[in-house]
């Protein structure tokens, strides 16, 4: 069983010995009686019944039959309280640890002689490498993107040799992971830790080259199912945000067979115990039996994992996502761990599971993993970021990696002595883990050199690895690898089947989860249904039956247009299915690759459970539209119409699902999906009737699902008896004439053919969706390798002879360990600034009481988060803001920094004695957020240039600004990676600690006097944290005021601070003031409080401080630390200092600036403009794909409408040409709007951070986003030229330069306003899903009222206003009149005989001489959409705090 971690809560045992002894005797007697009753049960019942003893405190929850007394219960019928009671008994220790439970389970196995299965993992001569670009060639610019495509083609054709450098990630490493021993994996950044874990889990990316052997119990990875044997716990937290923590773990337990594993164990165990007359522990027996039964709702295994991971307090909270509120980052990390360890796998490969956790929580989790390893003889290899000394000591063995080489592997207790033998000693008050991660660093190694009589010479990782191989530990390891391995044939340990439970059970689990997700997304589905109703009402009132009559072909064409629009709307209403599918893929891929379930078990519920939704959509549209428009009134035709809509909606959902699963990326799906939809739309039989389709497109016509739907719906309507009137233009009926004129069949059986084909397509698309899920892998973008070889003549230290490099060699300078500018005690850097003191006194902060708490009966209207908080932040003083989770650290920092946009603030906040003015304060303050949010497509240097240009005063020269940026880069050790692309967090670009240093540097280049830092070391390993803290310390030494919130830090990081503000839950201060040398002031203060446990020698003061001030400690001591502090001399000293510093110095005035921002709006605009141009230039997946799609779409259009531009013989020819232009405008415009949304969405998150930092006002930013306008304009211009020139000459419009130019102008303006509309949709909605849904409604209305489906002359007066505000209508008007408005060729058609321009004027309402007005209107639409986007950016914030 692999679910193991530590109970986080601490319970204090109450020692009442006499009462305790008598209670124990009573419980024992009761247990004997219950066990006797149990033994009288038939064998079948004994497997499902267990003895549940009374709660130790007599306050147990009900179990379906009583409270607190012992019972013989059927474990299958236990409710939630009953399960909790069983769990309490199993875990009942003073520490709520799992040691006793696991020891009891192991003892039960030992008692009957059953062995616990064991797995030994070996890897020998393992090398992992890849080929990468370096320097500027690695940047994803448009040129490089095209270059890469051409290069791949030439290489595959053997016409070019690869121009890449070999990067060795793991270099000939060997080792053994023993069962029953906890193994820690340590190493600095980029040392290959994650790659080693992935290699052992058989999860390496297919692009990586691997050599060497990995074996489990001597069996190669291809001889058994690795994923069911081992669990790789990733650094990335991919979860479905709508599910709660409990639901996430329940699903994982069902899929991994957590209960089934217990059943297998119990079968043999119970039989052997019965044979030998062994009576098991009632608590252990009850736990194991309860865990062995699968439950739909209440699962004991899930409750156990929740408890030991400390997630029980948030079990029913949604996990959440980037835009949806959920659990904290640390809790989400524990959910990731729980999801994998809940199953039966006994080999755990755990990759940095402690990110975001305080050291106390990490200790408890690792401690219980240790219990699991030692008792159940499991195999665990765990990498940790900053293991505290007490956590480090829990491990048995250590693997130390550096630059892809193993430099130590062996017992953890010998590692210090080993490095001492190499000449490196551990300093006092230094954690061993921190020492080990720094001793290989070129910059840090010298400080650990023990022999001061000799000069230190740097010992490289390669040299250390060679020395290790020759050491006693290396030879012992080699001997281990040479020996044979047992348990080779253990089928229980090394399963060969892929799935742990029957596939029917997996399908049930997936169905249950999908039902939950549908219920959680009910707003989205309700919104979409209401949208169908809304568009249906508009459609029915537009084609109102009082205005249409089934008497002639002209009216019939309007009926046909209405039917066609209904089909198109139902089809495109499923577009959001593609967005939702793509958003769910990361979680699916994780679970698929871990064999949670097969792909079809995921796709089947997606398909089946959308059937009722399709039915509802069809019913709503049919009921709203059918009789209001006045279609054929017989009931059978109404229900056939509804069936057809249901069929096309099901087909569309399958189509969009399939497109999402194949594309796997929103931009690619939108772009290439649009090309597919374009062909389906054009060849559906309405825009281009069958008789006009070119021979080379006949095949596409016959496979277009829309064609079958168009035929079926047309036959259903026009074969009705009311259309049997003989036409005035021939001997056939009006209905037959309409069908024949549009090349549609007249046989009624085509309805059933259409429905059958649509349903067949639905099945086909869902099968393809399933196959895509099963066989395609996620699109992975490689990390940019951009060392400092760009632009200044420096190289990458690459051996061009062998062309082979390790990570350390390629990134030799990436962490700034060479060539660093010395800046130990700079007094102010290049730019002067004013040192400032911040005082705050009796600060209170309230928010409105959450509705959930009001519903539980809480009477107060406000919830207080900060309570009378007072303190001082001074120049040259580094202050730590510390407290348990929920104590209000970040809240206080946000209040002081002016980042809170809601709530109620009370108290006195002063800057150097003057009242704080937020508009002024924002100019002199920096705020380093916990989340490192940056534009992915810019480099490090560009990020700093952008910040400095916008935030430094405009009177600073460019040269001075450049020198200042250079100095800051040196200060934070980023100068060696100045040309590295920032990239997307966790995917590409900078490492975590490099991003953190960049976040700090972005604030430093603003030359602030006061800097707030929220968790600057969170998510970093010890070495990276040391680099960041060195940066922070250097910043303080320049004379600035710096305050940091921080989790429980290591000793050396904690003691880098000068002062401390310690808070407890409820936002109350329990210590404020100096830390002292070796934290002596703080230690003396707390040890002066009676009965506080004194600190032991060498113990981390930060850990001790937080342990002795917990709520449990307060209860034990009977005191309130906040009250103790308020009555202390320490508090009085702080108060006196606040009073002293709250008085302004004589002759000083409050800070004043002439404007809110450092730069004027024109400068803000130009800087934002340049940044957006860089973002676009380096977004090839957006721009290259878009231009490629435009080329493909142009060729499709040109070939479908080949040479129809000069064909002007009938009204049908004119309408065909109009259809071509209508489809071109609509489809390419919609594609532009859809593909720009992901780009804008990413940059919006960056905007929120930059706007909060007062970099610029919202208008210049939004104006520069027009470069999502102005930057977009060159790309739209190229797009226009590609599409316009190809289609103009292929369609064969009139060879007239004026008409060509006008055609290009209209296309350019159309693409522009569609692009701006896509930005508006993002600006007005909180998520991309919602933007997609809202957009589809607008696209439908623009399609309906564009003047193509229903001419302007036939639009009712109550809707004509919408026609004039429909941008597509103006595009169509402009393009048609520019091409045909002056044509006098005579044409004939139903009800018309005259010239072309007369037809345009009389039937379509297009008048000549409107060219200038039409261009002006289209420009106005572009300006209007841009203005709405600018206003939305300024006024709406979907991340309000």
Curated annotation (Swiss-Prot):
Segments forming domain ABC transporter: 154-428, 838-1090
Positions of ATP 1 binding: 187-194
InterPro entries the UniProt entry points to: AAA+_ATPase, ABC2_TM, ABC_transporter-like_ATP-bd, ABCG_dom, ABCG_PDR_2, P-loop_NTPase, PDR_assoc
Pfam families: ABC2_membrane (PF01061), ABC2_membrane_7 (PF19055), ABC_tran (PF00005), PDR_assoc (PF08370)
Ranges for domain ABC transmembrane type-2: 505-718, 1163-1380
Gene Ontology MF terms in the entry: ABC-type transporter activity; ATP binding; ATP hydrolysis activity
Subcellular location: Membrane
Function, as annotated: May be a general defense protein.
Protein name: ABC transporter G family member 51
């Amino acid at each position: 069983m692999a679910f193991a971690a530590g109970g986080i809560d601490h319970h204090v045992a109450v020692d009442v010995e006499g009462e305790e002894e008598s209670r124990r005797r009573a419980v024992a007697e009761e247990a004997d009686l219950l066990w006797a009753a149990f033994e009288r049960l038939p064998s079948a019942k004994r497997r499902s019944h267990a003895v549940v003893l009374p709660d130790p405190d007599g306050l147990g929850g009900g179990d379906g039959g009583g409270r607190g007394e012992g019972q013989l219960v059927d474990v299958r019928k236990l409710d939630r309280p009953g399960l909790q009671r069983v769990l309490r008994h199993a875990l009942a220790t003073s520490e709520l640890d799992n040691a006793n439970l696991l020891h009891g389970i192991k003892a039960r196995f030992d008692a009957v002689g059953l062995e616990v299965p064991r797995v030994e993992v070996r890897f020998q001569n393992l090398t992992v490498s890849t080929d990468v670009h370096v320097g500027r060639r690695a940047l994803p610019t448009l040129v490089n993107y095209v270059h890469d495509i051409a290069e791949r083609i030439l290489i595959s054709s053997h016409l070019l040799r690869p121009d890449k450098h070999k990067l060795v990630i793991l270099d000939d490493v060997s080792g053994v992971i023993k069962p029953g021993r906890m193994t820690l994996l340590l190493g600095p950044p980029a040392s290959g830790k994650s790659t080693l874990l992935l290699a052992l889990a058989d999860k390496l990316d297919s692009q990586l080259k691997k050599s060497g052997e990995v074996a489990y119990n001597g069996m190669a990875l291809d001889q058994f199912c690795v994923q069911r044997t081992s669990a790789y716990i990733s650094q990335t937290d991919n979860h479905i945000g709508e599910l709660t923590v409990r639901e996430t773990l329940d699903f994982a337990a069902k899929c991994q067979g957590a209960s089934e594993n217990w059943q297998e164990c119990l079968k043999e165990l119970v039989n052997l115990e019965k044979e030998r007359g062994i009576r098991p522990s009632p608590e252990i027996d009850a736990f194991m039996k309860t865990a062995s039964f699968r439950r739909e709702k209440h699962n004991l295994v899930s409750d156990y994992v929740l408890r030991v991971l400390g997630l029980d307090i948030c079990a029913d909270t949604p996990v959440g996502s980037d835009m949806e509120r959920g659990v904290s980052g640390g809790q989400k990390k524990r959910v990731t761990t729980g999801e994998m360890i809940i199953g039966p796998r006994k080999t755990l490969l755990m990759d940095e599971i402690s990110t975001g956790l305080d050291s106390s929580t990490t200790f408890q989790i690792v401690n219980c993993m240790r219990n699991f390893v030692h008792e159940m003889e499991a195999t665990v290899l765990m990498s940790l970021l900053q293991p505290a000394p007490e956590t480090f000591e829990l491990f048995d063995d250590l693997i130390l990696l550096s630059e892809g080489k193993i430099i130590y592997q062996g017992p953890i207790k010998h590692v210090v002595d080993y490095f001492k033998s190499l000449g490196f000693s551990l300093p006092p008050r230094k954690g061993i883990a921190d020492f080990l991660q720094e001793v290989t660093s070129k910059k840090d190694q010298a400080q650990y050199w023990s022999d001061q009589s000799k000069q230190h010479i740097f010992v490289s990782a390669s040299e250390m690895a060679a020395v290790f191989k020759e050491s006693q530990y290396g030879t012992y390891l080699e001997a281990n690898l040479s020996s044979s391995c047992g348990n080779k044939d253990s089928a229980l340990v090394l399963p060969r089947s892929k799935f742990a439970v029957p596939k029917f059970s997996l399908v049930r689990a997936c169905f249950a989860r999908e039902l939950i997700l549908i219920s959680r997304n009910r707003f989205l589905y309700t919104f979409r249904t209401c949208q169908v109703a809304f568009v249906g009402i508009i459609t029915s009132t537009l084609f109102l039956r009082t205005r249409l009559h089934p008497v002639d072909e002209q009216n019939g064409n309007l009926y046909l247009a209405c039917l066609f629009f209904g089909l198109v709307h139902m089809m495109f209403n499923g577009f959001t299915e593609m967005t939702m599918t793509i958003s769910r893929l990361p979680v699916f891929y994780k679970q698929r690759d871990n064999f949670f379930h097969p792909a079809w078990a995921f796709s089947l519920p997606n398909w089946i459970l959308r059937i009722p939704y399709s039915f509802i959509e069809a019913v709503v549209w049919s009921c709203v539209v059918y009789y209001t428009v006045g279609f054929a009134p017989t009931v059978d035709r109404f229900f056939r119409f509804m069936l057809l809509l249901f069929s096309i909606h099901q087909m569309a959902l399958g189509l969009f699902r399939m497109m999402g699963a194949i594309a796997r990326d929103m931009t690619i799906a939108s772009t290439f999906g649009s090309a597919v939809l374009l062909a389906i739309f054009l060849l559906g039989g309405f825009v281009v009737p069958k008789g006009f389709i070119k021979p080379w497109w006949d095949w596409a016509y016959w496979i277009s699902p829309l064609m079958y739907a168009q035929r079926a719906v047309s036959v259903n309507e026009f074969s009705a008896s009311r259309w049997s009137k003989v036409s005035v233009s021939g001997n056939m009926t009006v209905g037959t004439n309409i069908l024949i004129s549009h090349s549609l069949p007249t046989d009624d059986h085509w309805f059933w053919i259409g429905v059958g084909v649509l349903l067949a397509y639905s099945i086909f698309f869902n099968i393809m969706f399933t196959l895509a899920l099963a066989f395609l892998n996620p699109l992975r973008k490689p990390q940019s390798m951009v060392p400092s070889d760009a632009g200044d003549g420096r190289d990458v230290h690459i051996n061009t002879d062998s062309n082979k490099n390790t990570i350390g060699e390629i990134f030799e300078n990436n962490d700034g360990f060479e060539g660093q500018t010395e800046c130990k005690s700079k007094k102010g850097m290049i730019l002067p600034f004013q040192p400032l003191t911040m005082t705050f006194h009796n600060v209170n902060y309230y928010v409105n009481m959450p509705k959930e708490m009001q519903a539980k009966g809480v009477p107060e209207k406000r919830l207080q988060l900060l309570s009378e908080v007072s303190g001082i932040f001074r120049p040259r003083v580094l202050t730590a803001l510390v407290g348990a989770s929920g104590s209000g650290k970040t809240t206080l920092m946000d209040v002081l920094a002016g980042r809170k946009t809601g709530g109620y603030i009370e108290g006195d906040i002063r800057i150097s004695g003057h009242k704080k003015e937020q508009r002024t304060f924002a100019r002199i303050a920096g705020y380093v957020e916990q989340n490192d949010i940056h534009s992915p497509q810019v480099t490090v240097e560009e990020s700093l240039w952008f910040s400095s240009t916008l935030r430094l005063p405009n009177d600073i020269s460019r040269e001075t600004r450049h020198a200042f940026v250079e100095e800051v880069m040196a200060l934070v050790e980023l100068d060696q990676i100045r040309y590295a692309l920032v990239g997307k967090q966790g995917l590409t670009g900078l490492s975590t600690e490099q991003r953190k240093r960049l976040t700090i540097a972005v604030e430093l280049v603003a030359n602030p006097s006061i800097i707030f830092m929220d968790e600057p070391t969170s998510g970093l390993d010890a070495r990276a944290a040391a680099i960041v803290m060195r940066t922070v310390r250097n910043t303080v030494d320049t004379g600035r005021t710096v305050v940091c919130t921080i989790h429980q830090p290591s000793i050396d990081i904690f003691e880098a601070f000068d002062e401390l503000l310690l808070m407890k839950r409820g936002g109350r201060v329990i210590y404020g003031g100096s830390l002292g040398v070796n934290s002596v002031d703080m230690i003396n203060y707390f040890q002066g409080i009676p009965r506080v446990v004194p600190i032991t020698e060498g113990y981390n003061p930060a850990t001790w401080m937080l342990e002795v001030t917990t709520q449990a400690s307060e209860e034990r001591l009977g005191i309130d630390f906040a009250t103790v502090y308020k009555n202390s001399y320490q508090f009085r000293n702080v108060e006196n200092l606040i009073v002293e510093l709250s008085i302004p110095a004589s002759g000083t005035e409050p800070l004043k600036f002439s404007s809110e921002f450092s730069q004027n709006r024109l400068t803000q605009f130009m800087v934002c403009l340049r940044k957006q141009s860089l973002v676009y230039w380096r977004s090839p997946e957006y721009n290259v794909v878009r231009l490629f799609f435009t080329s493909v779409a142009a060729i499709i259009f040109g070939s479908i409408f080949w040479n129809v531009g000069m064909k002007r013989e009938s009204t049908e020819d004119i309408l065909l040409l109009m259809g071509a232009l209508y489809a071109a405008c609509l489809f390419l415009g919609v594609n532009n709007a859809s593909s720009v949304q992901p780009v804008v969405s990413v940059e919006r998150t960056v905007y929120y951070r930059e706007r909060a930092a007062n970099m610029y006002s919202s208008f210049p930013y939004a104006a520069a986003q027009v470069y999502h306008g102005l930057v977009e304009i060159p790309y739209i211009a190229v797009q226009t030229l590609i599409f316009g020139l190809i289609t103009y000459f292929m369609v064969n419009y009139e060879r007239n330069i004026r008409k060509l130019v006008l055609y290009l102008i209209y296309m350019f303006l159309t693409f522009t306003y569609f692009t701006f509309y896509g930005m508006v949709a993002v600006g007005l909605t909180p998520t991309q899903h919602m933007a997609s849904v809202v957009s589809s409604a607008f696209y439908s209305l623009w399609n309906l009222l564009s003047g193509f489906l229903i001419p302007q002359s036939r639009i009712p007066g109550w809707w004509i206003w919408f026609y004039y505000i429909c941008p597509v209508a103006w595009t169509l008007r402009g393009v048609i009149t520019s091409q045909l408005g002056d044509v006098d060729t005579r044409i004939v058609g139903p009800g018309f005989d005259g010239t072309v321009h007369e037809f345009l004027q009389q039937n379509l309402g297009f008048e000549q001489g409107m060219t200038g007005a039409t261009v002006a209107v289209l420009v106005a639409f572009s300006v209007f959409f841009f203005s709405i986007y600018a206003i939305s950016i300024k006024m709406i914030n979907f991340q309000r705090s």
